[in-house]
Amino acid sequence: MLFDAFTQKRSRKITEEGGRTMQAVVLFEDGRWTNFKPLTWTRPVCLLRTGIFPLWEKVARACQAAGWQDFEVHIHTRRYLAPTLRHCLTGIRDKGRGTGRWKGVFVNELERLEGKSALFVNGRLLVTPELAPQASALEEGTAYLKGNELLAIALGERATAKVLPALQKGEPLTDADLQTLLDAASRRVEVTDALLLRYPWQLIDHNAELISAEFALATAGKESEGKLEQGAVIYGGDASRVYLGKGAIVHPTVVLDVTHGPIYIGDGSIVYPPTRIEGPAYIGKGTWIVGGKIREGSNIGDVCRVGGEVEESILHGYSNKYHDGFLGHAYVGEWVNLGALTTNSDLKDTYGSVRVTVEGEGKVDAGTKVGCFIGDHVKTSIGTLIYTGKRIGIFSHLHGVATDDVPSFTIWAKSIGGQGDAVELLLDSALEIHRRVLARRKIEATPEEAELIRTLFELTREERSKAGVRQGRPQL
């Protein structure tokens, strides 16, 4: 198990009876972030989700469970993401203060670590509830590795000061940077059973079991405050397996099936008939389920609009799948709109292994049940079909059938008319569509977001060039 190796006592433990705790936890990003594209074009790996909590929060909660108090959470990521990420995390930062959990969440503000002890954690590390309490046995001056990959390293004030220059460049850590961290440790421990995520489909593979495992953590000290209307049914278990947040409403004839796992429905969410939700399932705040078949392992973020059939899929906030269609074993980013009857495949006709293209590795076997990976701000037209294992780049528009990976900022219509077409989405169009979409949710687009979109447009030019995407107007 991940923290089993932390029980050796050759150096001082971080948490002891009457002792001190670390003053900060730092989630660092390494070069493997590219494996998770297009999802990580717009966020660090540690903000990806599986189960109820994102990866960074699983780490922070593990530290809390170990008895840490009044500590800071730091996210280290690419420089171009920092301004927008700080803005998005403002609510988390304010919420964190004074709660007895952590003092705040800070992005690339590593100067705050001067004079502090810190636990540096690889942002790809998956910490489960079973392992979290064992974090109390972490030892200062120790680096924890799996093979040749760094999982975590606990450093005192002086050692932390020595490694800060490696992180203050605002770029993912290189092998040389990681070696700088390792050199600051007085000893190393091999951890064989840790799970350091390498591919995006692993998030989906572990999602259902983590929703079940984290349900108790997410509902600890809380009672359901929502309304289960007369005629709504909890099937396969009792009400303790369902959590309804404040203002949540489940309408008559809706079925909540908890036979195989719990169901969490966040504050202000509404479930309309005819809907059947099978646990384990997580639905965030302010989301509407509008006549859907929400199958086991569904993980739907805040302020989404979801109908049709969803199975074993993860959706970030503000994404819409309002109409009929199927979404299976898929990972969907923020502000995505899937048009009516959009359907993805998650199983080959041959029942063979799905091969996903990973940057720097080529085709990688991902298992037999693999859907698609859809980046932020993607739009699909009515009747769009997406083949197994396809990656749909950020800000792209899909028409027809996607049998290949789709580059970012692309109007993709290769299956429509004649030889089809793939045309670059104009930057000005992307900015204006972004403004309109946010306005529909009564959110004002920020200058930081506009600058991020401009940067991403330039960073993804090579994707479009390699795929033969042309400039001009689409020929539909």
Regions flagged by a language model, labelled:
Residues 2-238, 408-476:
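Terminal amphipathic alpha-helical/low-complexity segments used for targeting or macromolecular assembly
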Residues 18, 63-67, 214, 220, ...:
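Generic detector of bulky aromatic hydrophobic side chains
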Residues 32-35, 47-49, 291-292, 303-474:
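Glycine-rich hexapeptide-repeat left-handed beta-helix
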Residues 38-41, 185, 189, 269, ...:
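Generic, low-specificity signal for short hydrophobic/alpha-helical stretches with a mild N-terminal bias
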Residues 117, 253, 395:
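Conserved beta-strand and immediately adjacent loop positions that scaffold enzyme active sites
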Residues 223-239, 243-245, 249-333, 348-349, ...:
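Extended beta-solenoid/beta-helix repeat architectures
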